[in-house]
Swiss-Prot record:
Reaction(s) the record says it catalyses: L-aspartate + H(+) = beta-alanine + CO2
Native species: Clostridium acetobutylicum (strain ATCC 824 / DSM 792 / JCM 1419 / IAM 19013 / LMG 5710 / NBRC 13948 / NRRL B-527 / VKM B-1787 / 2291 / W)
Family that this chain belongs to: Belongs to the PanD family.
Annotated binding of substrate, by residue: 57, 73-75
Official protein name in the record: Aspartate 1-decarboxylase
Active site per database record: 25, 58
Alphabetic keyword roster: Autocatalytic cleavage, Cytoplasm, Decarboxylase, Lyase, Pantothenate biosynthesis, Pyruvate, Schiff base, Zymogen
Entry's Gene Ontology molecular function annotations: aspartate 1-decarboxylase activity
Amino acid sequence: MHLNMLKSKIHRATVVQADLNYVGSITIDRNLMDKANILEYEKVEIANINNGARFETYVIAGEAGSGIICLNGAAARCAQAGDKVIIMCYCSLTPEEASEHRPKVVFVNDDNSISNVTEYEKHGTIG
C-alpha cells in the first residue's frame, strides 16, 4: 500500500500574470521551485485563496529571482493577477516512509520572495 502525502508547498504566493493564450501549465520562479523541491513538468495542485478554486496542472520553470507565478492556458481562467494561491505537490510513500516524512513548506512575501522554509506543518504553529 502507498499513501499520497504532501511533498511540498509554496504558501500564499501572489499570481503575477495569467496568460490564457499560452499552451498550459504554471510558470514558477526557479528559486521557489528549488526551495520547495518541485521539478519542472511535475504535477501540482493549486488552491486559489481568493475564490476557493482548486485545479491541477504541471510546472514550468521561470527565471530565478523574478518572483514569477504565471497561470497559463486554461489554468488562467482559475485565477487573476493579484490572487493568492497555495501550490501543492504530493508524493507516494509506504506507511513506513510516511511515518517519518515531513513536507517542505515555503512561505513567501507579497513579492514572492522567500520569507521562511519549514519541514513540518501543524495547525497554529507556523506562518
